[in-house]
Design a protein with these regions (language model features):
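Helix-start/capping segments and mature chain N-termini
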Residues: 1-168
C-alpha cells in the first residue's frame, strides 16, 4: 500500500506546498514523464519533515491542483464532490473512474477551479491514484475533514471494480 493501511480509514494529513505546479505552457504537464517529479519530491519531503503524509500542490495561478502523487476531491455539506479541472496536471485514470462511479451513485461531481480559501468550506476530502486508490484526507494545513461513509462507500465500490478487472 502507498499509505499505511490504518490511514485508509483515519485519513492522511497534507500541508500546502510552497512550490507550485508550472504553467501548462512551460512543460508537458499531461504526461507522467514530464519532469515534474523534482517539484513533487521536494514538496513531499518537506511535508514529511513537518509531520504530514503528503503535500497539496497549487497550480501556477494559485488554485488547488493535486497532491504530489494523486488527484484530489472534496465533499461539500450537500454530499457533492468538487475536483479541480485537469488543466495543469494529469487527468488520472483512477480520477476518471472515480468520477464515473460517483455519477453512477447519483453523486454530483463539479470539475472546477478551487481556491485555497475554499478548503475550510468542505467537510470531506480524498485522494485518487493508481497507488493511493482512494485515500481519505483528514486534514490539509489547519483545515480538518471527516472520513465519512460516502467516501468509504466510494472506496469500496472502486475496490470491487478494480478487483473484478484484475480477476478477469
Amino acid at each position: 500500500d502507498y499509505f499505511d493501511p490504518k490511514l485508509k480509514t483515519e485519513g492522511i494529513k497534507l500541508n500546502i506546498s510552497n512550490w507550485r505546479r508550472p504553467a501548462p505552457n512551460t512543460i508537458p504537464w499531461d504526461s507522467k514523464a514530464a519532469g515534474l517529479y523534482m517539484i513533487c519530491t521536494l514538496s513531499k519531503h518537506e511535508a514529511e519533515r513537518q509531520g504530514y503524509s503528503e503535500s497539496l500542490m497549487l497550480d501556477h495561478e494559485g488554485n488547488v491542483a493535486e497532491s504530489t502523487s494523486a488527484n484530489i476531491f472534496f465533499k461539500d455539506e450537500k454530499g457533492e464532490f468538487h475536483t479541480p479541472i485537469a488543466d495543469s496536471f494529469l487527468n488520472g485514470i483512477t480520477r476518471q473512474t472515480v468520477i464515473e462511479i460517483a455519477k453512477s451513485m447519483n453523486i454530483v461531481v463539479h470539475e472546477r477551479k478551487i481556491k485555497p480559501e475554499e478548503l475550510s468550506t468542505f467537510v470531506g476530502c480524498f485522494l485518487t491514484g493508481t497507488a493511493a486508490e482512494i485515500t481519505p484526507v483528514s486534514q490539509i494545513a489547519e483545515n480538518k475533514y471527516k472520513v465519512c461513509d460516502r467516501i468509504l462507500n466510494l472506496s469500496e465500490s472502486y475496490g470491487k471494480l478494480v478487483r473484478k478487472k484484475k480477476a478477469a
